[in-house]
Structures are given as structure tokens and as C-alpha cells.
Design a protein with these regions (language model features):
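Hinge/capping helix and adjacent helix->loop/strand transition within the periplasmic-binding protein
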Residues: 1-83, 132-137, 142, 148-181, ...
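Extracellular/periplasmic bilobal clamshell ligand-binding domains
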Residues: 193-219
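Hydrophobic residues within well-ordered alpha-helices
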Residues: 62, 88-89, 107-110
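Conserved helix-loop-beta element of the AMP-binding
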Residues: 9, 36, 111-123
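Conserved functional loop/turn residues at catalytic and ligand-binding sites
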Residues: 32, 77, 92, 99, ...
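Alpha-to-beta junction loops
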Residues: 43-47, 71, 89-98, 111-114, ...
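Short helix-initiation/N-cap motifs at beta->coil->alpha
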Residues: 53-54, 76-86, 90, 99-102, ...
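Beta->alpha turn/N-cap motifs
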Residues: 61, 81, 98-103, 117-120, ...
């Protein structure tokens, strides 16, 4: 076992990966987030939501959402992304909070409906889909449940090397062609200094620890 804050040195984040509330309209025929919440509240325990596994980002995002809004849904964990999204397409579950790049082809083909993205800002490739935080619903203010990827170095790495690596990463991420490539997949560039990234890691650990506790999440 290891501790990400004591055994590694944060170098730089790379991208924020947004999840999006994705529904099968043949199972739950609603057109916006308010209708979704009203339907779930009117039928506690009726609807199942899929995730890519216990404790996965898709699970954590929905767990936080349900806890904030007081929703009673049944969690159905699958062993990975393909099984989870397939369950929604088949109507075995009503919905999932999955990565934009995963659901995008199904959205474009009309098989699923997208109700809200989990990031604080809209996602470039699906700008027509509002953020959950902007819905105005009680409990959604400030909602930001994104996944990020970043680069770390081993504990004890020379700070000068960490700073140089971080600067190199930021310069690459700021290239227009790199930004465009990530945005086309539903992701957003994240620019932070090593010190800022260190704070992000610490704050997110505290946040998700509380979500795990409140939602009584266990890991397989």
C-alpha cells in the first residue's frame, strides 16, 4: 500500500474528465434534470443506475449526486465500462454517469439522452448539455464531480526537476492542437503549478473520503 500524498510528489495535472448523466429514454422518459429528479423522488427505489464498479468514478459521481439531492436509487456495479453502458442501452438500468467520450457516439445516434455534465463548466463537445451545478435544484449548487489525470514523481525527487517537468507539461497542454484533441473527446485541459496540484490532491482526498463515508461505499 502507498499514500499518494507522502510517497509521491505532484508534478502536474493533465486533464479533467467529465462524466455526464446519461439516460435511456425508453426506461425513464424525462428531458431535463428537474424531470429526472422529480421522477426518482416520486418512485423511491424503483430505478437502477449503473457504474463501472464499486468505488469507480462513475459510482462516486452518482453517489454524491444522490446524497446531495436525497434520491433513493439502486446501484448496479459492473466490471468495467463496456458492460455498464451496455446495460443502459439494453434498458437493464435506467442511467449512468459516464465519461463523455464513452457515451458520445450513443448520444449522436439518438440511443441515449444527456441531462447534465458533472463538471463546473460546460463541456466543449456537448455545449448544449447544461452543467448539473447550473440546474438551480436544491443540493446542486457548486456540484463538481470530475475525474482528473496527472503526473507524479517518486518521493525525494529534486524540486528543481519537479518544477522543470511541470513547466514542460504545461507548455505542451497549452498547444492549440493538444487542447483541441482533448476537447474533442469531452475532456478539459487542467493547468496548475506543482504547488497548486498538491492542494488539489489534498482537497480531493478529503472530499471523496466524505462521499465514501456518507454513501457507505465499499470497494470490491
Amino acid at each position: 500500500p502507498f499514500d499518494v500524498e507522502t510517497d509521491f510528489v505532484p508534478v502536474a495535472p493533465l486533464i479533467d474528465v467529465s462524466n455526464v448523466l446519461t439516460i435511456n429514454p425508453n426506461v425513464i422518459n424525462v428531458r431535463n434534470l428537474k424531470e429526472f429528479v422529480d421522477e426518482i423522488k416520486a418512485n423511491p427505489g424503483k430505478y437502477n443506475y449503473a457504474s463501472t464498479g464499486n468505488g469507480a468514478g462513475t459510482h462516486m459521481a452518482f453517489a454524491e449526486f444522490n446524497a446531495r439531492l436525497g434520491l433513493n436509487m439502486v446501484h448496479v456495479p459492473y466490471k468495467g465500462g463496456p458492460e455498464a453502458i451496455t446495460s443502459v442501452l439494453r434498458g437493464e438500468t435506467c442511467c449512468i454517469m459516464n465519461q463523455v467520450q464513452t457515451v458520445l457516439p450513443h448520444y449522436k445516434s439518438g440511443k441515449v439522452r444527456l441531462l447534465g455534465v458533472t463538471t463546473a463548466k460546460p463541456v466543449e463537445v456537448i455545449k448544449e448539455v447544461p452543467t448539473i451545478a447550473s440546474s438551480g435544484l436544491t443540493g446542486t449548487k457548486g456540484f463538481d464531480s470530475s475525474i482528473w489525470f496527472g503526473i507524479f514523481a517518486p518521493k525525494g525527487t529534486d524540486p528543481a526537476i519537479v518544477a522543470k517537468l511541470g513547466q514542460a507539461v504545461r507548455e505542451v497542454l497549452e498547444l492549440p492542437e493538444v487542447r483541441a484533441r482533448f476537447e474533442s473527446q469531452g475532456n478539459a485541459i487542467r493547468i496548475e503549478t506543482p504547488e497548486q496540484f498538491k492542494k488539489t490532491v489534498h482537497n480531493d482526498r478529503l472530499k471523496w473520503a466524505q462521499v465514501v463515508k456518507d454513501a457507505k461505499i465499499s470497494i470490491d
